[in-house]
């Protein structure tokens, strides 16, 4: 069974609240992010989430228009950069403080709505 974004967010919160796990996992995660290279293409982490599922489609529809345009621009620019086999100039790389989860709140909201709808669709009435 694939994990939901809600469960992944809970695991992340648990790791960040635990001092031992935080000291162990955060440096590894930061190194992984640096090696992944998506920031060098001008992408944020939320730009990498696959769009081909109903939850993500709902979250993208709920995204504010200006953020949606910024997302599309970042993705198109990254594709163009990849086609030319270059990286963006260092001053255009996404910095760690700029890489905030702009889409995750909408994904969690859409997941909660889908879960509630599923529970209501499968409700059993007992006497």
Curated annotation (Swiss-Prot):
Gene Ontology annotations for the cellular component aspect, listed alphabetically: matrix side of mitochondrial inner membrane; mitochondrial inner membrane; mitochondrion; respiratory chain complex III
Record GO biological process: aerobic respiration; cellular respiration; mitochondrial electron transport, ubiquinol to cytochrome c; mitochondrial respiratory chain complex III assembly; proton transmembrane transport
Lipid bilayer topology: Peripheral membrane protein
Subcellular location: Mitochondrion inner membrane
Residue ranges of coiled coil: none
SUPFAM superfamilies from the UniProt entry: 14 kDa protein of cytochrome bc1 complex (Ubiquinol-cytochrome c reductase) (SSF81524)
Signal peptide feature range: none
Keywords: Electron transport, Membrane, Mitochondrion, Mitochondrion inner membrane, Respiratory chain, Transport
Pfam families, A to Z: UCR_14kD (PF02271)
Chief place of localization: mitochondrion
The family this protein is said to belong to: Belongs to the UQCRB/QCR7 family.
Subunit record text: Component of the ubiquinol-cytochrome c oxidoreductase (cytochrome b-c1 complex, complex III, CIII), a multisubunit enzyme composed of 10 subunits. The complex is composed of 3 respiratory subunits cytochrome b (COB), cytochrome c1 (CYT1) and Rieske protein (RIP1), 2 core protein subunits COR1 and QCR2, and 5 low-molecular weight protein subunits QCR6, QCR7, QCR8, QCR9 and QCR10.
Function: Component of the ubiquinol-cytochrome c oxidoreductase, a multisubunit transmembrane complex that is part of the mitochondrial electron transport chain which drives oxidative phosphorylation.
More details: Present with 10100 molecules/cell in log phase SD medium.
Name of the protein in question: Cytochrome b-c1 complex subunit 7, mitochondrial
């Amino acid at each position: 069974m694939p994990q939901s974004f809600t469960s992944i967010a809970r695991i992340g919160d648990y790791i960040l609240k635990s001092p031992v796990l935080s000291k162990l996992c955060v440096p590894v995660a930061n190194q992984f992010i640096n090696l992944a290279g998506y920031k060098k293409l001008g992408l944020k982490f939320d730009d990498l989430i696959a769009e081909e599922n109903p939850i993500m489609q709902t979250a993208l529809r709920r995204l504010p228009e200006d953020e949606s345009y910024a997302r599309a621009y970042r993705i198109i620019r990254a594709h163009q950069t990849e086609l030319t086999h270059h990286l963006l100039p260092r001053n255009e790389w996404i910095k760690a403080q700029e890489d905030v989860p702009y889409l995750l709140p909408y994904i969690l909201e859409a997941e909660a709505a889908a879960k509630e709808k599923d529970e209501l669709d499968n409700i059993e009435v007992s006497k």
